[in-house]
Amino acid sequence: MSGGWDESKYVDNGEDEVVRQVSEPSVEEPIEASVTRYRSDEEKLDDKSSGAHVTEKEAEFDIEGGSRETSQWKHFLNVAVAGVALMSDGYCSNSIGTVITILRKLYPEETTHNKSLQDIGMIAYVGTIVGQLSFGWYSDRFGRKNGMITATIILIVSTALCTGAYGYKGSINGMLSALIAYRFFLGIGIGAEYPCGSVAASESSNELKSGLRHAAFIVVTDGAIDFGFVVGALVPYILVCIFGEHHLRIVWRLSIGLGLVIPCVLLPFRIAMKDPKTYVKHKVPLTKIPWLLVLKMYGFRLFILCLIWFVYDLSAFAFGLYSSTIVDGVLPADASTARSFGWNVLINTFYLPGALLGGVFSDLLGPKYCLITGLVLQSIFGFFMSGFYNQLVHKIAGFCVIYGIFLTLGEFGPGGNIGLLASKTSPTAIRGVYYGIAAAIGKCGAIAGVYAFGGDQVRNYFYAASAMAIFVAVLALLFVPKLKQTCIEDEDKRFIQACIDAGYGNPYNYEKNEPEQLEEPDRPPAFNPFLSATFSFHHIILC
């Protein structure tokens, strides 16, 4: 009797969970056997809810009474709605590189000896860091859904302001300054997407079938960023073909303004969605978390992930931002703007297969070894480009293909897997803060790359990027943990047990491997006017 799975003890409550029927142990059954039965049934209930054990009947219908295939698509839609807004990051990062090229051609006198264009490319990263750090706390405190809605609204407003940037009395320098200011707030919205959208996507992917969870996360986050990169290169090219070389002012404004499409489409879906079940189940007030224990358990792991993300973004975002400039340096001096943008589009399409293949192999090899494989292969192609750069620059087609493969391997390895590792190597209670810190340090690397790779020493840049890829691969091999399909549940259980062993108790308000105990209902607290006023104040603020 003890240790077996008994379907009669579980009933469908019509909602999202299976509820275990409470039954008293029989007279013949000793209390020790009852506890053992409870533990075994509870473990199998966890396995059942996570999809680890699926009966033939459950293979056709899920616990909500619908098709299991339909349920999987519903869960994937939740993952997509949470993560796909990162397309704005890729679009804004890449389209602004093309916009900078246009502004340099339109206003050579105002931009030749002025750092405004470089600041336009950099300032969004500063705002992104602010958004990542602040909304990391916000998403853990107020919920993933609230954070995503706020981030979407910020993206819509700031993108509209960037599109209509205008200087006082038509001043070009004033327009550039306004563009810098607006892109800072755009960066905050983009940064908010990381600890809100990406974290929600990782938690929602936990509801998918085992074997698809890593791929789903990478496709809707890194794949979305890469698709944004491609669209960010394609849109200016199409606009130049439509309006011509003599109407570049409308080209750069529309290139920015079309970035409104993504957040506007996503906003109603995000309003309708719910917080991931994992977050709802394991939400803990930040004041109740034993931060010293968290630092001891996750401090070094977070440091390694931050270092890897920093080094990767140091080259990755710089190459993305300056890809059109790099192509300009390879093309003849009399090449048209449309031709330059066209080759830039071709190069950026190589991002997409890297993200898709990276998602597939992340489930097959595991995120750790997929990351290492991509880094090693990328370094090989980088050293090749450095050694044969003088020959490649005279053959634009060959240069673009080799350069594109270099970018593909970057997305295959660290591009998708570093975000996956950051979102699934911490407990749910601190996942937003943990992920936000790692992503913010990565963006610091992107800022450093904007300045370090902003010159014309392209050959040396490939040398440096390849050497850094080898360094990151060694770090990952030595210190990055292996992740299983059940890594989110495993990390929560590990954190619970560590809190109990350290004497802090269970932060999630249930004891591992302990039977349920009947407790007397708590008496209602006495009326406290101060607490009542405080609650009313917080209620007004939140509303």
Curated annotation (Swiss-Prot):
Is this entry keyworded Zinc?
A: no
Question: Which stretches face the Cytoplasmic side?
Answer: 1-82, 138-146, 193-222, 275-301, 362-368, 417-432, 482-543
Write out the GO MF terms.
Answer: glycerophosphodiester transmembrane transporter activity
The UniProt record lists the keyword Translocase: no
- Transmembrane regions: 83-103, 117-137, 147-167, 172-192, 223-243, 254-274, 302-322, 341-361, 369-389, 396-416, 433-453, 461-481
Q: Which CDD domains does the entry mention?
A: MFS_PhT
Q: Name one GO cellular component term.
A: plasma membrane
Q: Which UniProt keywords apply?
A: Membrane, Transmembrane, Transmembrane helix, Transport
Q: Where is the composition biased (Basic and acidic residues)?
A: 1-12, 38-60
A single GO BP term for this record reads:
intracellular phosphate ion homeostasis
Q: List the stretches on the Extracellular face of the membrane.
A: 104-116, 168-171, 244-253, 323-340, 390-395, 454-460
Looking at the record's lineage, which domain of life comes first? Eukaryota
Subcellular localization(s) per the UniProt record: Membrane
Extract the InterPro entries matched here: MFS_dom, MFS_sugar_transport-like, MFS_trans_sf
Q: Which PROSITE patterns does the annotation name?
A: MFS
Q: Where is this region: Disordered?
A: 1-63
Recorded topology in the membrane: Multi-pass membrane protein
The UniProt similarity line reads: Belongs to the major facilitator superfamily. Sugar transporter (TC 2.A.1.1) family.
Cited PANTHER family: CARBOXYLIC ACID TRANSPORTER PROTEIN HOMOLOG
Protein name in UniProt? Probable metabolite transport protein C1271.09
